[in-house]
Amino acid sequence: MSVPTMAWMMLLLGLLAYGSGVDSQTVVTQEPSFSVSPGGTVTLTCGLSSGSVSTSYYPSWYQQTPGQAPRTLIYSTNTRSSGVPDRFSGSILGNKAALTITGAQADDESDYYCVLYMGSGI
């Protein structure tokens, strides 16, 4: 099974970082894609070009399949949304937010997005 284009939103940093003291040149670091065999485990990460991601950024993860609205999988680092299977888990891994899919299934083939809360100056 191929999990294509594990794309992450560029976080709309100009908007989300407004008034937060985050440099407007900060960008998200990401892997472009992953492949995983059915039943396998894959970990996707979401980092910043400068600084570390921590729980204070309240990392959230979204899954989107073509033609569908994004579905919230994880919010506040590691809280699963209602109805999300426990094979999806969120964490902080080193200095990045991480989404781990354990026991991957064919219908997990999707785009996955990470969103970080960068400040409250809006």
Swiss-Prot record:
Q: Which SUPFAM superfamilies match?
A: Immunoglobulin
Q: Where is this region: Framework-2?
A: 59-75
Its protein name is: Immunoglobulin lambda variable 8-61
Source organism of the structure: Homo sapiens (Human)
GO CC field: extracellular region; immunoglobulin complex; plasma membrane
Region of interest called Framework-3, as start-end residue ranges on this chain: 79-114
Q: How does it assemble?
A: Immunoglobulins are composed of two identical heavy chains and two identical light chains; disulfide-linked.
Cysteines engaged in disulfide bonds, as pairs: 46-114
Q: Any one Gene Ontology biological process term?
A: adaptive immune response
Segment forming the signal sequence: 1-24
Q: Which InterPro entries match?
A: Ig-like_dom, Ig-like_dom_sf, Ig-like_fold, Ig_sub, Ig_V-set, IgV_Light_Chain
Which Pfam families does this chain map to?
A: V-set
Q: Which residues form the Ig-like domain?
A: 25-122
* Annotated stretches, region: Framework-1: 25-49
Quick one: where's region Complementarity-determining-1?
Answer: 50-58
**Subcellular compartments:** Secreted; Cell membrane
Q: Which keywords does this chain's UniProt record carry?
A: Adaptive immunity, Cell membrane, Disulfide bond, Immunity, Immunoglobulin, Immunoglobulin domain, Membrane, Secreted, Signal
Q: Write out the ranges of the annotated region (Complementarity-determining-3).
A: 115-122
| Complementarity-determining-2, as annotated region | 76-78
